[in-house]
Amino acid sequence: MVEVLGGEPDGPESCCGGDFCGPLKNTKEKHRNARACRFARTLATLLREVVADCGWITARRGRRSIKKHDRLAIDSLSRRDTAPALVYFSRMQATTLTLGHSPDPDDAFMFYALAKDLIPTHGFRFEHILQDIQTLNERATRGELDITAVSIHAYAYVSDKYALLPSGASMGDGYGPMLVAKQKFFREEIAKKKIAVPGTMTSAFLALQLWLGKPAKEFDYVVVPFDQIFAAVKNGVAEVGLIIHEGQLTFQNEKLVLCEDLGVWWGKENNGLPLPLGGNVINKKFDLATRKKISDTLTASIQYSLDHRPEAVVHALQYARDMGRDLADKFVGMYVNHWTLDYGDKGRESIRRFLGQAYERGLIPHRQELEFVV
């Protein structure tokens, strides 16, 4: 129970003259003091000003503010004229959902409104699980999270447990994961080098196999956390690095050179389609109606950030890892845009083609039938 105690009365002049108090008191009874009227006014104000949108409740009483993701219910009211006003709200615990995403500025931007309680959440609370994409991919194979970001490559291994959400995509539209090195290498040379990769379930790794025309077992690679790939190349652990995230904008600062942009290559080979890198998925344990409600909430969060870009970018800066505001804003714009609000026909086709080619070349075990929340 959440108990709200009435404060001190404003004085006799605060009496409403019965307009508010009348419905709550015997109309034949006179107001004995301002406190009784204050109670009635408080209740009327609460009932008028409570904003309840399926779990979003804001109740204001004077200078005090109550924000609870609860359904409002008045269990009992003290009608004693000289007692403090007592208003009880029965608390209906909102459903808590785990939401996995990477600690990167684009994901932080996307979920700004959820992190700061800026939009209605339709009876849900979101527990943000911040982990690198390879870890999230692995957790998704075990069905551990309610909603999570995954690599599109990983979707091929979790489609029995998760459905794709229509929003939340990260598309490389004329850009994407990059191969960098201390000196320029061409494809035939790279195929013979040791490559530092950010994870075997990342879309970058699948794109690399498609670009090389070889399955992973036929070339040399080492898995390195994505934020340590520069160091791996510079220290000689690997000769080539497959970089994702903001490394695509900062590799020159590390005195490395670009060998290939896999997003550019993919677009040339596939009629200008974007390279599908990541998406959000929802656990199939939820019924269709619940999936849709959650999906709409996540889409609303993305739309809010796009509509309030400056403040959302400021929030995202805390995850920017050595990027200034301008660079972080550029990175966010690369991966949170119209593709993120909805894949659209081209976005869906790019996933079909990406996973279809992977299956035809024996890089994933099953042909995929995409299942989207609608």
Please provide the spans of the model-predicted regions.
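Beta->alpha turn/N-cap motifs
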Residues: 132-134, 143-156, 225-226, 243-249
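Extracytoplasmic small-molecule ligand-binding "clamshell" domains
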Residues: 106-110, 119-151
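Hydrophobic/proline-rich hinge and linker segments of small-molecule sensing/allosteric domains
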Residues: 164-187, 266-285
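Pocket-lining segment of extracytoplasmic ligand-binding domains
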Residues: 225-318
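Secondary-structure end/capping motifs
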Residues: 286-357
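Short, positively charged and aromatic/hydrophobic N-terminal segments
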Residues: 23, 42-45, 71, 76, ...
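Cysteine-centered motifs
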Residues: 15-16, 21, 37, 54
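Bilobed "Venus flytrap"/periplasmic-binding protein-like clamshell domains
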Residues: 93-116, 130, 177-240, 244-249, ...
